[in-house]
Amino acid sequence: MNPLQSIQHNITTPPISGGQPLDAVGPQAQKSHPKRISPSQLSQSAHQALERLSANAEHQRLASLVRKALQDGTFQFQSSNHTQVTYKASICLPADTDTVRTDLLINNELTVKARLNDQSEYDIVSAHLHGSSKAISFDVPSPPPAHGSASSVLSERTHLVMSRVLSQDAVDSSRLETSLLSSPDHSRPPSQPKPVHLGSVRRESGSLVSDNPVVQALLSFAQADQAFPPQAASIAGVQLEMRPRRDIEKALEEFKGAFTVEKAQLMSGANSSERVDEDVNADIHIPLLLKAIERGAAAFGPNASIGQNSAKAFLASCAPKITSNDDVLSEFINQKLKGDDDLQVRLGAQELLHVATKKEFQLGGLAGSIGVSSILGSAWELGASELLKNAIFGKNFSPSQYALQLAGIDSVPPLIIESMDTMCVLAIIKGMKGEEWSMSDLLPKALKAGAISSVVSFPNNVLQYAGFKSRVGDLAANSVTTEAAIFGAASGIPPEVKESEELMRAGLFQSMKDGVMAHPGEGVDTKKTIERMTRHALDIAPGESTAVKSMGLASIVGMIPLIASNKATGLLSEQVLRIFRSAVFNPIEAIALNALALGGRVNVPGLFDSDNAKHARVVQTILARASQHMEAGDRDISAEELHQMLAPRSEFLRHVGSAIVNGMNASFEAIPALVRKLGYGEAPLAERIPYQDLAVPDTSRQPAP
């Protein structure tokens, strides 16, 4: 093997049509070429190519060499044919730069090949610098062709490629060509998805490092048991990207469809030993993905499949692909990932989970809520209320004398306003979950919430006309009744969250029974396991998690009118407060839902993380665990550890909202529970899940091997 191998920088123009060069026409075939070529003889596209190279520090050295040789007149004519002419120059490379490694230098010749266009100017076709160890690639668009001639077509697009050919000591006489893109975004096809994680890579103390934590974790995994090839990231400006391998949103829909549990075998309401198939249509894709991140392929049972593919193979196909402007680097890492099925499953699950938990702004629902609440609320607060009361009690009536009647009148509008507003709020939650909804499904829930709001708002309305003599006592009573009114206005949310929780539990139970999800293990409390999985999933699910947090936010913001009123600080007049109640207080749930969706995109280091930052930490943990434990069985991430990354304990609004939702659901369930104790009614779905059945495998639903 030759220890001194030629390493070249190339600037090339790819063939225009079918890979075949065009025959010379016009001046190209007629004119003789000068012995020396100067800058004035170059076309505008050639100058633009050199200027584009100069814009990057890594490219500047080579562009300078070409321009200097042109200015000095050292490019001398060598040969020509029907399509191009060749010029060469002998150059002296500076000794204080690592642009060329002198120990690998073969010669110091700079070769330029050019083509004469129909304007008698030269377009650069290629340039070769022998002896360089650098490798870059560059695209430069040329100006539109003039006169439509064939020679002008050649200058429509000038493609500048600088590539290197490096020797590999491990492979006799083999050579690797690395094309480095000056800008990943510049060369990305329009249809190619943007990278999820992107970082620069450099060599440091013999290893490859990156300032991006996720990319650094990927590099650590790749070089955990094998060093990178010496030619990988051997120049500055190397970037590494993790980008989706396939259409992740489409893949998520396939995953959701495959793992939606339509029916579950539950206990009969009349006989607990009897099992009945009940429609649940339970969506369990988020807890499944969480479990796949925690345990890899071990999360699934023998019957977990998506079409003709196993769940393991499907998730592995969703793992991100690694791209780089250094082909040696990306090829090495992709080969490492390809040989690690467990890691691909976990990374694929994380890719899907990232999309599954993405919170989208719901403009339609917000506009509907503000329109209904603000318009109807303002019409009542600023006009209709006073007109109606004056018509009934006279213009100079005493509010304290008719406190109960006036409070009753004020409690009627919430029945209408909150019913319509709850429709919008539930539509927002359904939209965030990506679920279809119909008016017939939401209307009963909305009317129930409107009725609750109307009843619960009555005590607060009474205190607006007949308060306590004690200022402190009056403020305390108003605080309690105001919070009750807020909860009543949002009474459509807690039952929606509870319904999702019960259906998910039933779905997880059935998936374990059917061998889709792996059994928790012998001696493990399956009920507690399923309850924990459900809680962890709903804490990050886009619809339910945002709904719960919105309850916490509404309970705080909803107190502003009371605090600013003359019952407390007196900061705002009653007229202003009426407008505030109409514009903000009434549609507070819809505003909170969308504000929280947008807030998930904000990242403030040290205070709170964006959703993207949380998922990046999960990817980093998956890769770090793989680096520490090359065996798949030792890489498990605990459920609590993963939950802490995605739903930190510091999420104040989640804790407040959860307490409110659980408390409201308990109060809603109090009377039905009492009725059931008297022997009437059917037990709720959550109480009819036969967790004890999971102790015995259900072989009747499992296919024969």
UniProtKB/Swiss-Prot annotation:
Keyword Phosphoprotein among record annotations: no
Ranges for region Disordered: 1-40, 175-205
Keywords for this protein: Hypersensitive response elicitation, Secreted, Virulence
A GO CC term attached to the entry: extracellular region
Biased composition (Polar residues): 1-15
InterPro entries: Plant_immune_effector (IPR053430)
UniProt-listed GO biological process terms: symbiont-mediated perturbation of host programmed cell death
Localization terms from the record: Secreted
UniProt keyword annotation of Lyase present: no
Domain of life: Bacteria
General function of this protein: Effector protein involved in non-host recognition.
Protein name: Effector protein AvrPphDPsv
Organism, as annotated: Pseudomonas savastanoi
